[in-house]
Amino acid sequence: MTSHRGRRAASIENDALRVTVLEEGGHIAEIADKASGINPLWRPDWPSIEPSTYDPSRHAVYGGGVDASLLAGIMGHNLCLDIFGGPSAEEAHAGLPVHGEVSTARFEIERTPASLTMRARLPLAQLTFERRIDLAGGAVRIRELVENLSATDRPLAWTQHVTLGPPFLQHGRTEFRASGRRSKVFEGVFGPADYLASGAEFDWPLAPRQDADGGVRDLRVYTDAGASSAYTAHQMDPALEHAYFVAFSPASRLAFGYVWRRENFPWMGLWEENRARPGAPWNKRAVTSGWEFGVSPFPESRRQMLERGPLFGTPTWGWIHARGRLSVEYWAILQNRAAIPESLPWPV
């Protein structure tokens, strides 16, 4: 076990990359290019602590909301499992955090020179979760297994919440590509600096603005606004076996992205928090771009997820059988590039 920004962690590396995961929360904290030292993943500017040490009476810096225990330890690529979004009032009273207990769980980690295997038991959700990470040059192979410990079939939310941040992420410069098709803006108010038309449906990547003149926002370039907030949901192209997103930093000449099987994760959410949220721990300072691929289009309660029904003909939640298991495989790729690739192929 090693330390990363004051947190208990484990790392593996090869000539090209270093990958670091956190013991508590299981977050993939960095996928760093060793030549430049740049990690495209988001590192919050507030102090990071082990979620098990979070105490609302002593840690007002993380805010007083139901998401405080999550925010106390969040970093990089975090997992949303069993729910994607906030718990109901009753679930919160029973101890369930935003995005599920996995983001505050303690993981057992086995390390070899080229692989990490992480395991956690989720007693509230009655699930177990396992993730194996292997390095292959400039690519990271990630395999996950979810097991249902209960005797009942059940719906399931399962989302990979990948968040990019500076210095890789730059206003008006960082570019994006994705295999999106039909898309929809979050319904209602998402943040204090919303600028997209609430609930509007559109084709990737041109999202309708709130402007009366019918303007659009090209989601293929990070915003250059002083402050902004947005969330859009994107159906991954049904005609493709593999879905992907890729981001490119002209300053570092690095392309970073993920590729996965569309049948596993048919949705991707694009989250923009750009110096907009005033409360702790955000304090109008965070600059993020979240690329959240999973089985659900929107962060919402369990009931809302179930009541939504199919969107654009695509299911909006997953299913796991009694005592059943579900497994997925996906890749993260970090490459030196002179320009953004228009797609991200599945590694051979």
Feature locations, PLM:
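Surface-exposed acidic/polar loop and edge beta-strand patches at domain peripheries
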Residues: M1-R141, T152-V348
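Asparagine-centered strand-capping/turn motif at beta-strand->loop junctions
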Residues: L145-S150
